Amino acid sequence: MALKQEMAKSLLKTASLSGRTKLLHQTGLSLYSTSHGFYEEEVKKTLQQFPGGSIDLQKEDNGIGILTLNNPSRMNAFSGVMMLQLLEKVIELENWTEGKGLIVRGAKNTFSSGSDLNAVKSLGTPEDGMAVCMFMQNTLTRFMRLPLISVALVQGWALGGGAEFTTACDFRLMTPESKIRFVHKEMGIIPSWGGTTRLVEIIGSRQALKVLSGALKLDSKNALNIGMVEEVLQSSDETKSLEEAQEWLKQFIQGPPEVIRALKKSVCSGRELYLEEALQNERDLLGTVWGGPANLEAIAKKGKFNK
């Protein structure tokens, strides 16, 4: 009996590892399926009914992409169409083999005020809320797993879902006058785009509970003190702060795309997978760069790195 139980545990763990590996690496794989009551095409049709704004993507020759949340008349709130466009841009970025880094920003010097209330008012049932929740969790999880080093450039306000989006980025930078606020409690809800889970990982459970239950207004100084952001930029000017963010990001993406992308994938697997599976993935990723052009060039130079 004990042997059978041990075998069952082993099989369960193997199945779980296999599922998690597929989840991490299979492009287009959804967190949810019809078995969870999630019908993606139906959700897309619903979201299509709420137009407004756009998600704009600019891909630079230096391997940095700039993703702009563009709905300034509503503080860059997400309309239904913008949610759909965000998924489209994530898929495009998944296939951008020359990409190394990504900056997420809002148009007109403000980040985002979250969901467009016009859409929210029309999606009033718990079933509606959970459907959008699953759609955005899918999208932002795929975003988080992009093989690009991502930075949220917080200019102005990041409210509600906008604050949640910042947590899907690898790093966050704020301008001196900007603020982040998880305002969900004041709306009678909780974060539902994965923001709670990611916030706990970023600042710890105690700080996350304070930030969420207090609906705290985090200015740049407070956000820096609790580890929410990496740095406060010098300028609040829209153009200058974007230039600062680009310079900040460049220090982490020096090198060939295949190496930067492998590093990001390895970190993702280390965060999300069991130890054995993460180590195997690290091995497989090493195989994609060992003996490659960058590796051979570094060996030929016989560089010293302890200076």
Swiss-Prot record:
Species of provenance: Homo sapiens (Human)
GO biological process, one term: fatty acid beta-oxidation
A Pfam family recorded for this sequence: ECH_1
EC number: 4.1.1.94
Chain positions found as N6-succinyllysine: K217, K301
Listed CDD domains: crotonase-like (cd06558)
Function noted in UniProt: Decarboxylates ethylmalonyl-CoA, a potentially toxic metabolite, to form butyryl-CoA, suggesting it might be involved in metabolite proofreading. Acts preferentially on (S)-ethylmalonyl-CoA but also has some activity on the (R)-isomer. Also has methylmalonyl-CoA decarboxylase activity at lower level.
Listed name of the protein: Ethylmalonyl-CoA decarboxylase
Catalytic activity: (2S)-ethylmalonyl-CoA + H(+) = butanoyl-CoA + CO2; (S)-methylmalonyl-CoA + H(+) = propanoyl-CoA + CO2; (2R)-ethylmalonyl-CoA + H(+) = butanoyl-CoA + CO2
Annotated positions of the N6-acetyllysine modification: K217
InterPro entries, A to Z: ClpP/crotonase-like_dom_sf, Enoyl-CoA_hyd/isom_CS, Enoyl-CoA_hydra/iso
A GO MF term: methyl/ethyl malonyl-CoA decarboxylase activity
